[in-house]
Regions:
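Generic protein-terminus/edge-of-domain signal
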Residues: 1-57
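A generic beta-sheet turn/junction motif
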Residues: 46, 62-64, 89
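Short hydrophobic beta-strand segments that form the core of ligand-binding sensory/regulatory domains
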Residues: 49, 74, 84, 94-100, ...
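Short acidic-glycine-tyrosine-enriched beta hairpin
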Residues: 64-79
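Ligand-binding loop in jelly-roll beta-barrel domains
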Residues: 81-112
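An amphipathic alpha-helical interaction segment
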Residues: 114-167
Length: 167
């Protein structure tokens, strides 16, 4: 893992960023950082969460299941699902995008699941690394790129991996 690939302002997780994720209903929130903790307490968001990690395995626990997130995979967490995050090491890098719910969202977005990441998604994830915080609809081309990122997920994520155990 190369920490130089993380924007300077977002090198370590600021636990208060989670209160900002839902500050603006129509924004897409972007956050890349080293976790630097052994545990992120149970919480939830009003937005859907795309979670990709590097540098170690991450366990995500919900009220129903415990998910095992390996390298080169992402976890889709629909809005409103309570979850806690347990990295295998505090040096794990979290790459998050939080998307507002849309009336025309495909059924894919309502189901929590783990999916493999291909080279296209890796490149898009790394492209968003330069962004930190809210991205508003008036911020073009950022908002369109982030929206395209979300819209392509169902097409690229045809095979959910059953890497979860009942809790």
């Amino acid at each position: 893992m190369n920490t130089q690939d993380i924007s300077t302002d977002a090198k370590y997780v600021n636990r208060y960023y989670m209160t900002e994720v839902d500050s603006f209903e129509d924004s897409i929130y972007c956050h890349h950082a080293i976790i630097a903790e052994n545990h992120i307490s149970e919480h939830w968001h009003d937005k859907d969460q795309f979670l990709y990690t590097e540098g170690g395995v991450v366990f995500v626990t919900t009220e129903e299941k415990s998910y095992f997130l390996p390298a080169r995979h992402y976890l889709w967490i629909p809005a409103g699902i309570k979850h806690s995050i347990h990295p295998s090491t505090p040096e794990v890098v979290m790459r998050n995008l939080y998307f507002p719910k849309a009336a025309n969202d495909a059924p894919f977005y309502s189901k929590m699941g783990i999916y493999p990441v291909n080279d296209l998604l890796i490149e898009l994830i790394m492209f968003t690394n330069r962004w930190n915080g809210n991205i508003f609809p008036v911020e073009e081309p950022k908002y369109s790129i982030a929206t395209a990122f979300k819209l392509i997920l169902p097409e690229l994520s045809l095979h959910e991996l059953p890497l979860a155990l009942p809790y």
